[in-house]
Regions:
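Cytosolic, membrane-interface loops and tails of multi-pass inner-membrane proteins
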Residues: 20-53, 176-191
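Multi-pass membrane proteins that catalyze or facilitate reactions on polyprenyl-/lipid-phosphate substrates
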Residues: 2, 6, 15, 136-191
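Interfacial segments of multi-pass membrane proteins
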Residues: 45-48, 67, 71-75, 89, ...
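Transmembrane alpha-helix interface/packing and boundary motifs in multi-pass membrane proteins
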Residues: 11-15, 24, 87-97, 130-134
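N-terminal signal-anchor transmembrane alpha helix
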Residues: 2-26
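Nucleotide and nucleotide-moiety/phosphate-recognizing core
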Residues: 6, 52-54, 62-93, 126-127
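Short, non-helical or kinked segments that cap or interrupt transmembrane helices
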Residues: 30-38, 96-106, 135-143
């Protein structure tokens, strides 16, 4: 029963579409009709309201931190269930007919909660890649790949869970990958 309660509550928290909600409240627009149509932080930045974009980023990270930290300290055997459930909630939110974000900010929240070192590795990798390329999508893919590689090489750790997360992030970025390959991807302004 704990397993199901943790999975469901983590999914529901992860499925709160903050980019959609904030854009509706403050801009009176549907974020799904702006930029890429995605509900996440990068597209929230494309609304032209940087504060809204950063608020979306913070809230999308937080909605993973809350259930994962709670489970980490109270039901540690279920930490990966809580993590995956929150992540899937963001990707496939019940509130938006299962059409959600790409999962990067939520993944950062998961990493920071499981082991803040992993979160910092992700963030630093993302920033370095972004400074070199100006592509948010490429930065997300590189940083997501670095986590399981780091764990395999330096921690001798079973990184199956993190490989699954990378595959899901790659899947959500499949259109970005095509645009990157064809040199049609838009660069992102984050400041």
């Amino acid at each position: 029963m704990e397993y199901l309660t943790i999975a469901l509550s983590s999914y529901l928290l992860g499925s709160i579409p903050f980019g959609f909600i904030l854009t509706k409240i403050f801009l009176k627009k549907d974020i799904r009709n702006i930029g890429s149509g995605n509900i996440g932080a990068t597209n929230a930045l494309r609304t032209g309201n940087k504060t809204l974009g950063y608020a979306t980023l913070f809230l999308d990270i937080t909605k993973a931190v809350l259930p994962v930290l709670y489970v980490k300290f109270n039901y540690p055997d279920y930490i990966f269930i809580a993590s995956l459930s929150a992540f899937l909630g963001h990707l496939f939110p019940i509130w938006l007919k299962f059409k959600g974000g790409k999962g990067v900010a939520t993944y950062v929240g998961i990493l920071l909660s499981i082991n803040y070192i992993l979160g910092l590795i992700f963030i630093i990798s993302w920033i370095v890649t972004f400074l070199l390329s100006k592509y948010s999508s490429l930065s997300s893919l590189v940083a997501s790949l670095i986590i399981p590689v780091y764990l395999i090489i330096f921690e001798n750790f079973n990184s199956f869970f993190f490989i699954i997360m990378f595959v899901l992030i790659f899947y959500t970025h499949r259109e970005n990958v095509k645009r990157l390959k064809n040199k049609e991807e838009s660069k992102t302004k984050i400041y």
